[in-house]
Amino acid sequence: MELFNVYPLVNITPVKALGAKLWDDKGQEYLDFYGGHAVISIGHSHPHYVQRLTEQLQNIGFYSNSVQIPIQQELAHKLGQVSGYEEYSLFLCNSGAEANENALKLASFHTGKKRVVAFKGAFHGRTSGAVAATDNPKIVAPFNADHAISFVEYDLAAVEQVLQGGDVCAAIIEPIQGVGGIIMPSDEFLTGLAALCKQYGALLIADEVQSGYGRSGKFFAHQHAGIRPDVISVAKGMGNGFPIGGILIAPELKASYGLLGTTFGGNHLACAAALAVLEVIEQENLLAHATEMGHYLRSELEANAGAEEIRGRGLMVGIKYDFPIKDVRDKLLSEHHIFVGNASDPTVLRLLPPLNISKAEVDRFLQALYTLVALSSSSAHERSEYVEPHR
């Protein structure tokens, strides 16, 4: 049997990882400035993470949600404490798409309505409702096309026009669009959106799958705007590579048996991984570190990268050029051995390093980028010599 290959694969086989570094089967070292799509939050093979998972596996790795699993409540308590959402409830699942699927389903159950307001450029996953709310027709199958979705720009008047129809169960928004190219709605827009949802009786779902867990310098990116969504989707950095997702649910939304369900969600190992992540975020003060390193990275890029725009917050950064970045990205990997990401906009380079990335590792990336950008753009642009990153 062969794999059903849906990804274009680079010819690299990682066999070891530690912190922000990977090694392939030939012994070549790589710098991870992408974290496997924002998944690696506390660094590869963090000792506390490895210990937590090892100890849990030596006791019990899995049993179904038909029995008492105290580590689930331990995780819920810790997540509420660290995130500032202690009064919310937690439903656990396995991925970001599944989290968004359950968020949308919960909103529809709660309101008795079905229409969803989503935003241009959004990505919420590849399952039924989540992909319907994703602004990419190429990945929406005919089977997924019958959902009632209204895509709008970041325009409060346009949002209100849809809400006035009276059939909207929820608005779902990424506080920072990841796949879309690190696009940020303004804090004022998020505040206005929250007010409109409340006015018209629709739930506000914050998709924090990529932007959450300290990535923006706050635990959740929407906290920069001071809003409190009704439902918050989490995954990716939540497990640092172990499959886990979830939704944080406002106390006004009540649970009933059978409303949502999962076989593997919230298993013992997944909860151990998620607890380890929260413990390391706290113990190593990674929110402050992400803020500090993010500020340093963006200020250096703004001064020296020759870009049209530097986007993002914390360690969720987009670099927009006036030319396609494919060649730069390919050479960062093949010549400088640095993993970075791309976006749906071919001119945007996406950076999502571990939250504990060091200044020396940031400088290594910057020097490689400046060299390649100078070469890539020299035929079309006059450029001054780049400045070395500040030490």
Task: List PLM regions with ranges.
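Conserved N-terminal phosphate-binding loop of PLP-dependent enzymes in the Aspartate aminotransferase
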Residues: 1-391
